[in-house]
Amino acid sequence: MFLKLVDDHALVVNVLLWCVVLIVILLVCITIIKLIKLCFTCHMFCNRTVYGPIKNVYHIYQSYMHIDPFPKRVIDF
């Protein structure tokens, strides 16, 4: 009974440990949510700054390299 003020059968310690566990779980969940938001933000940024211009350059290249098919008259001879 040394250092025991109230005989609560470790209820206070149990409650404190559960609070610590819940706080850790909450922090992990918040971190995961923030990480997912960061991934979406990076994707939107790359979509505007990298993927969009590359797509435009590719379409310009496609239109430049396009070869019209031969007319039917030329093929028949």
Curated annotation (Swiss-Prot):
Residue ranges, Virion surface side: 1-15
Q: Which UniProt keywords apply?
A: Apoptosis, Host Golgi apparatus, Host membrane, Membrane, Transmembrane, Transmembrane helix
The protein here is known as: Envelope small membrane protein
What are the annotated GO cellular component locations? host cell Golgi membrane; membrane
Question: What does the sequence similarity comment in the record state about its family?
Answer: Belongs to the alphacoronaviruses E protein family.
Q: How does it sit in the membrane?
A: Single-pass type III membrane protein
The annotated subunit structure for this chain is: Homopentamer. Interacts with membrane protein M in the budding compartment of the host cell, which is located between endoplasmic reticulum and the Golgi complex. Interacts with Nucleoprotein.
Give me the segments passing through the membrane: 16-36
Domain of life assignment? Viruses
Q: Intravirion topology: which positions?
A: 37-77
Where is this protein found?
Answer: Host Golgi apparatus membrane
